[in-house]
Amino acid sequence: MTTNRSAPSATIVPILVYEDVGKALEFLSRAFGFKERLRAEWGGAISHAQMDIGSGSIMMGKQGGPFRVSSGDTVSQYAHVHVDDVDRHFERAKAEGATILKTPEDMPFGVRQYTAKDIGGHWWTFSQNIRDVDPVEWGARVADR
């Protein structure tokens, strides 16, 4: 595979739409700990940006054409991000103005997690592994490979 400094190296990179990409860059950095990778300005405004967190990446684009910011209280997708300390992450997100949808909770599949909404209406679940759990314990079946 050819390396390209203009593109994230992650295998899957979601692209999220925001009304104001610059404000989204600032918010995701402050509230969720993302690190800016690059930004592109066209017509005097940031229209594209990339951010990293851990080994993952996201791209962001400005609303326009068929791409619209989510409206309402339902979503068809959300991002799940693993962090080292979910309680500390939760406190940071809350202090920086993230809308908390679900407070930290221990889940039967071995993670502690919370869910928040960002300034663009995107939902994010942040989790921390707290114990190793056999998937069968919580009702999952491991696929044959």
Language model: regions and residue ranges:
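C-terminal catalytic core of tyrosine-transesterase DNA break-rejoin enzymes
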Residues: 120
